[in-house]
Every structure is written in C-alpha cells, then in structure tokens.
Amino acid sequence: MNQASFFVADKAIFGGYPSWEQVQELQTAGVVWFVDLTEECEKNVVLYHQLVPNWINYPIKDGGTPQNREKFLTFLLAVQILVDGLGPGEKIYLHCRGGHGRSGLVIACFLAMTLNISPKKSLFLVKLYHSQRPNLVNTRWEREWPLNPTQKRFVQKFFGTFLLRSGFEAENTSAYKKSDHVWYFVRINVWLHQNPQLLAVVLNSGLKTIKGEGPVSKILQQLRYYILFSKAKKLVDCCS
C-alpha cells in the first residue's frame, strides 16, 4: 500500500484510512490488528471494522490532539501490547484519515515511550518514516511536517508534564509522585482485566524478555511486574 509506511520494522504500519480493497491488501500482507483514530462523524469514510477480526477505535478530532492525557497513555500502552504480542509475519495498521497529523502524533508519542528517546528525536523519526511513502514523492509532504504546530507541541510537552515518564530525563519532574505512579497502574490493571485478550498479551510478553526476543519498554516491564505482584498478593491474602 503506497499510502503507508512502517514505524516498527516489519511489524507496525501507519497511514491513511483504507478502502475495502486496501483492507484486503493489508490483511494479505499480514495485518491482524487495525487501530482507527477517526471519529464517527467524519464524512466520506467507508466503515470497514466489520470486515476485520481485530479493530480498535481511539477517536481524535481531525487536526486536534487527545483531550485526556491519562486515557491517551493507556491507549499508547495498548498499542505497545499489541505490537509486542505480534507473531511471526503478523502486523498492525494504525491510521487516521489522511495518514498525516493524528497518526503522526500517536506514533511520535509511541516511539518516545517505547524507545526511551526524546520527543524531538521521535518527531524527527516520524517525519522520516512519513516521507518515505511512495505516494508522497515529489509532493509537499515529502518535505513538510505531517503534524501541525499544535500537534507537535502536544508531543513535545506530553512526557515533560505527565506523571509517568519514559527513560529520558523529562523537562519537568515536579509533577511526578510515587503515589501517582501506583495509582496509574491500579487503573491500568483494572482496564486490562476488562480486556482479557490484551491482559493475556501483556503477561505472555514476559516470555519474550526471558528468551531475549526483543526489548520491552520500561513502562511495560513495570506494568507486568505490578500485575503479577497484585495477583500474587491476592493469593497470599486468601491463604493467610
């Protein structure tokens, strides 16, 4: 599909809203998860989610940014869980409508979180990956940023002000508290137990770490530890 590009080599793709034919093309290429960032009210969009087995919708207003940062971080974690749980040859496709701003914003935050790099570096990578699409050659998109200024500012500030930080040094650490950190994982734990398929993926991802089959981000490692710790504590409490 010439309107898309990889953001995780051979595993994760981002691009524009797919037509029915492109959905079939993506499935043939190994895509097993579709992540949709569009809203229900958007015009000239042909719904496809009933044609695919696995579909997640996290709507962001066209040209806008996520309104709830905690829910957005939960969503980023869900995307990482899906990518981490992909089998050989399997892929995930994340898209907005045009495949530029909203998807670029999500991928920039995703890369900063999973690779432990600065927002500046993640934005550069998104611009690089975005410019490599065949349909953008010799167009303004080959040179310009896929994100608008508001979306770029969101990425730049997201990790500097949010209570849960990645491995790089955030600009503002005053908002970070241990109690906030624990409370965040409590909420994520509850949410994952409401989504058994994702819960199984995050627990099984521990096998990848043991086998050395690829890096798992610090945040995902901490979450897995918290879930297992809470399960073990319940067993101890029941037996005591």
From Swiss-Prot:
Enzyme class: hydrolase
Pfam families recorded: PTP-SAK
Entry EC no(s): 3.1.3.48
GO molecular function, one term: protein tyrosine phosphatase activity
Catalytic reaction annotation: O-phospho-L-tyrosyl-[protein] + H2O = L-tyrosyl-[protein] + phosphate
Active site: 96 (phosphocysteine intermediate)
Official protein name in the record: Putative tyrosine phosphatase 067L
